[in-house]
């Protein structure tokens, strides 16, 4: 399996996990934040999609993020700016998805764009340097660290939150 195939397969698994995250949840459960320092399932979904959009569209391709170009903030009732990194617990608790259907449309669009971008690459392209704030890293390292590993961690966080509410995890018996 090539590196790109591995990335595509892993991101597809992560996408399926986030698609299933709200299944069977009430609005209250979707926005439940346990005591202490944590996030809601809604926050995890929003953050993951925004990060994926930011990296695949803006950082890797120099294009406007789908969030802005598609007018998704107005459709979903979510903030126009920000993506959750460095956000205080208080601000994270304010993330509220008012239209789950619209938000899932955004999730699907971001997933399509990400997989299309990966499909346009060859192994050599993964060696290209990409500029982040204070440093550069290879495209392959950036995809693995900021998308594959980071987003899969939040997918696991969703399952923990579901378990805290007495619900089954997403993708049970599939490496959930």
Task: Locate each region found by the language model.
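N-terminal export signals and maturation junctions of secreted/periplasmic proteins
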Residues: 1-5
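Short, contiguous alpha-helical
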Residues: 8-12, 19, 29-85, 129-176
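Hydrophobic alpha-helical core bundles mediating ligand binding, dimerization, or RNAP-core interactions
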Residues: 11, 15-18, 22, 107-114
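A structural signal for long alpha-helical coiled-coils and helix-turn connectors
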Residues: 22, 26, 119-122, 162
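Short alpha-helical scaffold segments that flank and stabilize functional sites
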Residues: 24, 51-55, 117
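Acidic/histidine-rich alpha-helical segments that form the ligand environment
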Residues: 78-128, 145-147
